[in-house]
Amino acid sequence: MTDTPLSLIRNFSIIAHIDHGKSTLADRLIQACGALTAREMTNQVLDNMELERERGITIKAQTVRLSYPAKDGKTYVLNLMDTPGHVDFAYEVSRSLAACEGSLLVVDASQGVEAQTLANVYQAIDANHEIVPVLNKVDLPAAEPERVKAQIEEVIGIPADDAVEISAKTGLNIEGVLEALVTRLPPPVGDESKPLQALLVDSWYDPYLGVIILVRIKEGRLRKGSRIRMMSNGAVYHVDQVGVFAPRMVPVDDLGPGEMGYINAAIKTVADCNVGDTITDDRHPAERALAGFKPSIPVVWCGLYPIDADDFEKLRDSLSKLRLNDASFHYEAETSAALGFGFRCGFLGLLHLEIIQERLSREFNLDLIATAPSVVYRLYRTNGGMEELHNPADMPDGSVVEKIEEPWITATIMVPDDYLGAVLTLCSERRGIQKDLTYVGTRAMAVYRLPLNEVVFDFYDRLKSVSRGYASFDYQMDGYEESDLVRISILVNQEPVDALAFIAHRSAAESRGRSICAKLKELIPRQLFKIAIQAAIGSRVIARETIGALSKDVTAKCYGGDISRKRKLLEKQKEGKKRMRQFGKVEIPQSAFLAALKMDH
């Protein structure tokens, strides 16, 4: 089954903006090649996580092997990788692209080129891919194929006159896509007589088989029963099973150069699988490793704590299994006075954070609290030391800090020009600096530099709401710059609550401090004594709210008679409340934490 000559193999990925029809096109290609029977076919076959179907987005890159009898009489093997379109999963995209030689660029014929399309295309061009433009949704009344072709040529700079016009939903001209793949994409190169070199593209955990690894063979042959070695750490395994996805797992005897498939080698420890590693034969190892992927750098950090403290070990196991499946996610243990034991986790963006949280609660049945997301600051001390700050609660006193640098991004925003004004206002409110503004037809492309801290909380939601959902947004990290940043501590009854501390620009500190105090005032239940909720920068209080005391009517039992009796009781109550205020502990309910952290910043 795997003795296909190299000239008849095509490895390709599908890249596009969110909702431009990647996964639907993948369904049609699978159907056209007869890989699944009509009964097994469902919409978005490759989106096999329940979460992916629910949200209608692709999170994990998936792979499938198809055989296609072309018009030239030969039968080709097509290895398809469906990639995510979201900027938060760009790491998944870069891995898929490294395993392929060409890409189908899918563009919605009614919407045109969007910000994510650009980001993913540039990644494909960097990977030296042959790119075949495909216009999807040409059956829609609003479709303008000619305008979009001109836009592809103008914005991306690749010829689009021979773009394939299709409708993935109705199956129109799917044959044209398959023919374009066969005729326009280059075959892989490789030599099966050389020592084995295979790229580890992905890995995940199967409850029955243990760790399963997805590989792309570059040189040599990978056989069932052979001994393999991981080149990064020298770990050696015995291969139990080799196979391909069609899209079900189909075992085969061996995989040759240019092929994509999976191996199962009884790998017990999750840590031994580093995505981007090179796998070679233990007896005849390759001389050098393949160029892997650049490791992903987490951009957003937040604390995850189990609501039930007994779940800590379960959370640790769950995180290590998720890390195997999603190499772009990092975690380390930490403790908090308010929330107990938990983990500080690093993500590529807010959607990534949300998805990991959802997966932990669905796949591992964990109830978690997440602290407010923060970015990584660089802190320079007066004694000359530099450290990275992941947690706002760890920020030292201002007297020992010389300067703080925060990360900036370059954001590309595509928006119809009717909504441009609102988008520019939003960017300048968030301390943005305009770098470029160009028009492509009726759409504007704005390039801004923005502090990541301002984008992390709700920038994406606000952008969608001011542009009625039409704006699309993509960003790249763009270094660190010094800024006037302060740590705001939240104190409840004079006690600092470390989980609610955050870092903000001095200009926004007061308004954010005030809004979080007002929110907590609504959420913390009243006690028998007054509770002060304060936001402070160092020792200076910048906002305060007071929760009034519950009053118990101690004089109810007195009737008429002398005032001194009542006064005595009231004085006694006053003394008691004073003592309570001194020693009373305020329990902040779980719901108050969640609501304060979710707050629209």
UniProtKB/Swiss-Prot annotation:
Location, primary (coarse class): membrane
Membrane topology type: Peripheral membrane protein
GO terms assigned for molecular function: GTP binding; GTPase activity; guanosine tetraphosphate binding; ribosome binding; translation elongation factor activity
One of the record's GO cellular component terms: plasma membrane
Localization: Cell inner membrane
Keywords tagged on the record: Cell inner membrane, Cell membrane, GTP-binding, Hydrolase, Membrane, Nucleotide-binding, Protein biosynthesis
The tr-type G domain, residue ranges: 7-189
Keyword Cell inner membrane: yes
Keyword Hydrolase among record annotations: yes
Disulfide bonds: none
Entry's EC annotation: 3.6.5.n1
GO biological process: positive regulation of translation
Catalytic activity: GTP + H2O = GDP + phosphate + H(+)
Name by which UniProt lists this protein: Elongation factor 4
Domain of life: Bacteria
Binding-site residues, GTP: D19, H20, G21, K22, S23, T24, N136, K137, V138, D139
Family statement drawn from the similarity comment of this UniProt entry: Belongs to the TRAFAC class translation factor GTPase superfamily. Classic translation factor GTPase family. LepA subfamily.
Organism: Gluconacetobacter diazotrophicus (strain ATCC 49037 / DSM 5601 / CCUG 37298 / CIP 103539 / LMG 7603 / PAl5)
Lineage: Bacteria, Pseudomonadati, Pseudomonadota, Alphaproteobacteria, Acetobacterales
Purpose: Required for accurate and efficient protein synthesis under certain stress conditions. May act as a fidelity factor of the translation reaction, by catalyzing a one-codon backward translocation of tRNAs on improperly translocated ribosomes. Back-translocation proceeds from a post-translocation (POST) complex to a pre-translocation (PRE) complex, thus giving elongation factor G a second chance to translocate the tRNAs correctly. Binds to ribosomes in a GTP-dependent manner.
